[in-house]
Amino acid sequence: MTNEEFIDHMNCGLPVQCGSEIHLKMHELSQEALRITSQINGKYNPPDELGRLMQQLIGQKLDEKFGLFPPFYTDCGKNIHLGKAVFINAGCKFQDQGGIFIGDNTLIGHNTVIATLNHGMLPDERGNLIPSPVHIGKGVWIGSSSVILPGVTIGDNAVIGAGSVVTKDIPADMIAVGNPARVIKSIYD
């Protein structure tokens, strides 16, 4: 199975059964992600080397204004899609198998978790994985230690308060805070 076939399967939202070919490919990609993130996190890397490693991890050319403060962790890497001038602060964890799409000029605070996989709810199906992408618009600011759950879309220019758990879509231009995150006002108020 190629990386492209894996990404296509995951981006369709099809379940992944434990032990299946797609599950084995997921494990293979996770091992590569562990190897590359250990290089990112294991020592100081000048910005150009950090960019090269991140491009290798996600398989995408990065904008020269991309910023990352390690450590950074991801379970796959190949289904992260970054816009221009994205900044990811230290300690972030991306579970990207289901797809993480981040728009231009987005800021992601320390220790943010973005998850894209769920498990079956019935005990006999818990080993199965259900991918669901996360879409983060342009100009979004995600505060430190936030958790973004599978299937969420955050609209352009939204602000997510520190420590929030985002379980549902957040409209553009809104500020959302809390657990679960709730819209409290417009950024223009």
Regions found by a protein language model. Name each.
Residues T153, T167-K168:
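Active-site/ligand-binding-proximal alpha/beta "capping" segment
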Residues G155-A158, P171-D173:
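Conserved catalytic segment of ABC-fold P-loop ATPases
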Residues M1-D63, A181-I184:
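Terminal amphipathic alpha-helical/low-complexity segments used for targeting or macromolecular assembly
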